[in-house]
Amino acid sequence: MRAREIERNCPNLWKWGIMLLGILMICSAADNLWVTVYYGVPVWKEATTTLFCASDAKSYKTEAHNIWATHACVPTDPNPQEIELENVTENFNMWRNNMVEQIHEDIISLWDQSLKPCVKLTPLCVTLNCTDESDEWMGNVTGKNVTEDIRMKNCSFNITTVVRDKTKQVHALFYRLDIVPIDNDNSTNSTNYRLINCNTSAITQACPKVSFEPIPIHYCAPAGFAILKCRDKRFNGTGPCTNVSTVQCTHGIRPVVSTQLLLNGSLAEEEIIIRSENLTNNAKIIIVQLNESVAINCTRPYKNTRQSTPIGLGQALYTTRGRTKIIGQAHCNISKEDWNKTLQRVAIKLGNLLNKTTIIFKPSSGGDAEITTHSFNCGGEFFYCNTSGLFNSTWNINNSEGANSTESDNKLITLQCRIKQIINMWQGVGKAMYAPPIEGQINCSSNITGLLLTRDGGTNNSSNETFRPGGGDMRDNWRSELYKYKVVKIEPLGVAPTKAKRRVVEREKRAIGLGAMFLGFLGAAGSTMGAASVTLTVQARQLMSGIVQQQNNLLRAIEAQQHLLQLTVWGIKQLQARILAVERYLKDQQLLGIWGCSGKLICTTTVPWNSSWSNRSLNDIWQNMTWMEWEREIDNYTGLIYRLIEESQTQQEKNEQELLELDKWASLWNWFNITQWLWYIKIFIMIVGGLIGLRIVFAVLSLVNRVRQGYSPLSFQTLLPAPREPDRPEGIEEEGGERGRDRSIRLVNGFSALIWDDLRNLCLFSYHRLRDLILIAARIVELLGRRGWEALKYLWNLLQYWSRELRNSASSLLDTIAIAVAEGTDRVIEIVRRTYRAVLNVPTRIRQGLERLLL
């Protein structure tokens, strides 16, 4: 009643209160944020993984074997994808790049594997009786120093034949650089020699059909990973890069093993680039990438003939049998103009970086032949070329002119080269290789695309700086090509706050998930989170293609090398990449399954978003941030969020299990089913609607009937006296009596009030009828209960009576049976006893009978 009084007195206050309460409820509901899982977001993290190779080996040279074993690589993509990532800045570091270590290990493995089936030259570590090669082969070559470099020794030595206790003497030609006098006797009259590496390294002869020609190798990332590429034209190898793209494979990298000069690599697109881990540290190598290549043409003008010398069962040593007349030493030619122009640009660049005015280039300061010379492979022979003619000049940065150059005025710079057959392996200490001689004349042309330099040390504060050629660590050769790449791991799972909360409904059926991550969708990496989430469907459809394509590549690679009955390092990497891709896919699908999000791109959860993880507003997150920025912000809380989602899903599944366990009562309490309740509600609404309709119809009929009888209905504003109770006195003049609170009532104030009053009366009527019905039902239940209780007591008494009667009858029956059995038993015993006595008395009766006969 007090509520109705407040409603009548303060209607506006009542309305505003209800409105304010609704607004508070809406605001409180809107402030709740929930964790939502997104699958297929463009997010990556730095990682190290197994890369596989792609190559077009068949298009270069058809041969049975090459040292790079590229026939085990997958074919290159004729239309490679490169997707530019807008608004993305990524840090690169060429000096801490695992791709360099990986290619280094792969090339070492390929070299070692190519030499495994080849002949070991351990039996050749014997005394060699050598004499100088005949002068008739020297031709027009003059000069003692030159002839000593190219002169060969004619050596004879004893080897074991097929019969191991037999030896025979054979002859072979060796380069002077490949043998040393025994007992360190360096005199020219010495005749006893040995191979140079016999006391330090194990020597293996390269197989005669193995080729050292470098073939471009593309390194590719497996599914679930991607290769980021820096496209800045002046990128120095370290630091942030603002022009980033994603590729599946690198460009074709030629595994050229060389020192001092980088051959057949990639060129800088604009100006010369100087790269060093620390330019002020003279112990660090300096890699120079040229913007214009310099041609270098090398030749061995004389021709060799090769012979096969058996050195044991199934083994042969390939040596030089003879040579044509030598018309010149092995050498390389470089255009003087092109080289000086290139060296001038390099000097200017170095001077500007080091703030020096004079740059000096000098030859190598000493060391092994591989370091002091430009060593490389030319047509199967290993050349060691003297580069003092290249690095012997001084450049003034101010006038950009060379000074104190010792070069002649010839248009070509000629580098004198020596050839060695016993090679110190660059893979490590203690390994050497014997390269069989190549028949015929040798010519090769290459392009100088880079330099490897070292800076002289000291505390010299002058304006001069001295640089020398360096090299020897093949990792620097690979860095010169891989400086712009890095491998990243795709993280397709992302979590972010949204206003959507998971609704717990019937247990969902788990769908088959989508495939593993591929690089195609990374194009949305620079977009905001809101824009990137719109393309999740397109992105996720590309995921499975990674594994499918990898499977096809693997099958093609295995098919290509199945005749070998073994896997090279590339085949092993193919298998590793395939397994890794499947593992990534299964890991992501396992997480989605644990979270109840299998087969979903956007999956809501019941985990509330904690503002301590990120207190940014929803609009700021989705409109101003990329997925990469968002992932970096919540990276420390990702593990916690994952655990909360898992716990929430576990609790939800427990609740669903308990709910499903209640279904076994459906056969007994089917009317408790929600569908049945909906049917009951529908029937109730129909009944109420029918009652309201009947009430309206009856009211209209009553009104029409009264009008026909000449009755005018009262005004809606007429106050009717309310009926009084007989024991309530009417008021007196002194107002001593008590007045009733409802002496008169106002009918209605309008049509809405009429409807409301009618509905109220109908509800009261329904309430009273339902109450009476419930009371009647309760009375009936009470009577039925009482009657039932009495019936149960009657049945119980009846059951007790009959049980007692049955018990007595059973007892009587047992007694009767016992008596009958006892009597029968006595009779049987008596019969048996009499029979027994009769049998015992038979002899007595016989004796008595005989006595009577005798008497």
Swiss-Prot record:
One of its GO terms (biological process) is positive regulation of plasma membrane raft polarization. A motif (YXXL motif) lies at residues 711-714. Keywords: AIDS, Apoptosis, Clathrin-mediated endocytosis of virus by host, Cleavage on pair of basic residues, Coiled coil, Disulfide bond, Fusion of virus membrane with host endosomal membrane, Fusion of virus membrane with host membrane, Glycoprotein, Host cell membrane, Host endosome, Host membrane, Host-virus interaction, Lipoprotein, Membrane, Palmitate, Signal, Transmembrane, Transmembrane helix, Viral attachment to host cell, Viral envelope protein, Viral immunoevasion, Viral penetration into host cytoplasm, Virion, Virus endocytosis by host, Virus entry into host cell. A lipid is attached at C763 (S-palmitoyl cysteine). Residues 364-374 are annotated as: CD4-binding loop. Residues 32-683 are extracellular. Residues 385-417 are annotated as: V4. Inhibitors targeting HIV-1 viral envelope proteins are used as antiretroviral drugs. Attachment of virions to the cell surface via non-specific interactions and CD4 binding can be blocked by inhibitors that include cyanovirin-N, cyclotriazadisulfonamide analogs, PRO 2000, TNX 355 and PRO 542. In addition, BMS 806 can block CD4-induced conformational changes. Env interactions with the coreceptor molecules can be targeted by CCR5 antagonists including SCH-D, maraviroc (UK 427857) and aplaviroc (GW 873140), and the CXCR4 antagonist AMD 070. This is Envelope glycoprotein gp160. It comes from Human immunodeficiency virus type 1 group M subtype D (isolate Z6) (HIV-1). The gene is env.
